Amino acid sequence: MGWRIELSRRAEKQLAAIDAPEALRIVRYLSELEKLESPRSRGKGLTADLSGLWRYSVGDWRVLCRIEDGRLLVLVVEIGHRSTVYN
């Protein structure tokens, strides 16, 4: 059984606001995560105020996720440009 990717409402809106080619690139990246044994193998754990979240870099975009091991779920909570996503 593989991992499941879900987007929060906020992340869905943010993805819809991104140019189509970049949004497609992000969606393809997320679909690759579903196939991995551990989604942590490609991401980076965040610290300080964002501890508990994982970051994935897709070009100039950052995808911030919460990983729930018990449910095999990667919940995308924020998608944004690298210059503003951490604000």
Question: Over which residues does each language-model region extend?
Answer:
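A short, surface-exposed loop/turn module that caps and links secondary-structure elements
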Residues: 31-57
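Enriched for short, Lys/Arg-rich terminal
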Residues: 1-9, 13, 17, 21-24, ...
